[in-house]
Amino acid sequence: MLADKLKPFLTRFDELNTLLSDVNISNDISKMTALSKEQKNLEPIVEKAKEYLKTLDDIEENKLLLSDPELGELAKEELKNLELLKPNLEEELKILLLPKDPNDDKNIFLEIRAGTGGDEASLFVGDLVKAYIRYAENRDYKYEIVSSSEGSVGGFKEIIILIKGNGAYSRLKYEGGTHRVQRVPETESQGRVHTSAITVAIMPEVDDVEIQINPNDLKIDVMRSSGHGGQSVNTTDSAVRITHIPTGIVVVNQDGKSQHKNKESAMKVLKARLFEMQEQERLAKESEARKSQVGSGDRSERIRTYNFPQNRISDHRINLTLYRLDAILEGGLFDEIVEPLIAYYQAEALKQENL
């Protein structure tokens, strides 16, 4: 019974309130921080649980009043409303009770790379960057370009953007994979549609506790920054290239104004890539039944097609097709895709958890 599953959460919430008011604990900053975070995470479940349990009590109370000559009709009407409310609250609670992705509240590194298609792929990376930035602005997320390499005719060969905001990972984690674009290039005189592809990786920003790197495993090179076309744009050796020797992962950063800033940014990206690698290995070891049905976020998985002649955007994981490509890209309206993906994932997770 759902009500029984809620009791441990209510009990723990009361325990946390008691602990947080304890003078001895209030002097321990790290303990206070951990308990406050746990309390905050429980609040949505507890609030909804209290509303649900009150609804159950109200239903029973109104059932007793049905035979009352004066209050019977009023109780009947109230009971009707409560019976409609009950299943809605149950569905909301089931979703709240799903195991939480520990990365959901984290900031992300959004990495986009041009794949097949040459200049057209680079141009589309530029278009997608603008769309993601608009999406970030729509949700009041902060963002900064960590590193970039411009395409020869515009756009980017590759770019990494740090997006900061509560729930950034939870909203954008489904973007990882191969995105295919179909459109007529401006240089195409015959009007033929060209197909190109880009890859997107979503990596949660991690701290030193989550990923520890042995300094002896790193090869750090400094060099002069190069701009569009490869020309030097800096007379000092401010660009930094970090190679993680055990994995062969290489991170280059030259967008910052100082060597220190570039090294700091490159280390953050390296940690995120190593964390992503660990997550992919972990997912690969899990049984198929536990994997998300919407995909693993693997860069090689083709997840979406953008067809400009048809103004169509299709997400292949959930067979979603929208004929609003221009509006979605220009307005950064990715929630029109994100929301159905989240709903699908939650439905699959509910089946797996037997809720």
From Swiss-Prot:
Q: Which residues carry this modification: N5-methylglutamine?
A: 231
Enumerate the GO terms in the molecular function aspect: translation release factor activity, codon specific
PROSITE patterns from the UniProt entry = RF_PROK_I (PS00745)
What UniProt keywords apply to this chain's record, in alphabetical order? Cytoplasm, Methylation, Protein biosynthesis
Highest taxon above the source species: Bacteria
What InterPro entries is this protein classified in? PCRF (IPR005139), Pep_chain_release_fac_I (IPR000352), Pep_chain_release_fac_I_sf (IPR045853), Prokaryotic/Mito_RF (IPR050057), RF-1 (IPR004373)
Gene Ontology, cellular component aspect: cytoplasm
PTM text = Methylated by PrmC. Methylation increases the termination efficiency of RF1.
Subcellular location per the Swiss-Prot or TrEMBL entry: Cytoplasm
Location of the region described as Disordered in the Swiss-Prot/TrEMBL record = 283-303
Record keyword Ribonucleoprotein present? no
What this chain does, per the entry, is described as:
Peptide chain release factor 1 directs the termination of translation in response to the peptide chain termination codons UAG and UAA.
- PANTHER family, alphabetically? LD18447P
Entry-linked NCBIfam families:
prfA (TIGR00019), PRK00591.1 (NF001859)
Query: Member of which family?
Result: Belongs to the prokaryotic/mitochondrial release factor family.
Output this protein's name: Peptide chain release factor 1
